[in-house]
């Protein structure tokens, strides 16, 4: 997670997607992460509760945390 002075900052969806799919192009990685979100009912529900929109470019710290909680840390 991006942290500055102990505070968590927003993270771009493309950066998170690249962390999960480092061998993919940014566009392909983003498409795959969106696919994973769409296929995971619990993750999709929890993100919707946090006002996530499918094509938003930046994630709030809470949205980012939910994705990592449901999918695991990138690289695991």
Roles of regions detected by a PLM:
Residues 15, 32, 63:
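Ca2+-coordinating acidic residues in Ca2+-binding motifs
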Residues 7-24:
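Polyanion-binding surface elements
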Residues 57-76:
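A short, Lys/Arg-enriched interface patch at domain edges and termini
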Residues 23-58:
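Major-groove DNA-recognition helix of helix-turn-helix-type DNA-binding domains
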Residues 1-7:
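Positively charged, polyanion-binding regions of nucleic-acid-associated proteins
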């Amino acid at each position: 997670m991006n942290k500055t002075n102990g505070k968590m900052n927003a993270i771009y969806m493309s950066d998170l997607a690249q962390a999960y799919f480092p061998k993919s192009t940014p566009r392909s990685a983003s498409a795959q992460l969106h696919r994973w979100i769409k296929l995971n009912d619990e993750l999709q529900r929890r993100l919707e509760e946090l006002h996530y929109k499918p094509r938003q470019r930046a994630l709030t710290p809470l949205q980012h945390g939910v994705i990592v909680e449901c999918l695991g840390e990138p690289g695991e």
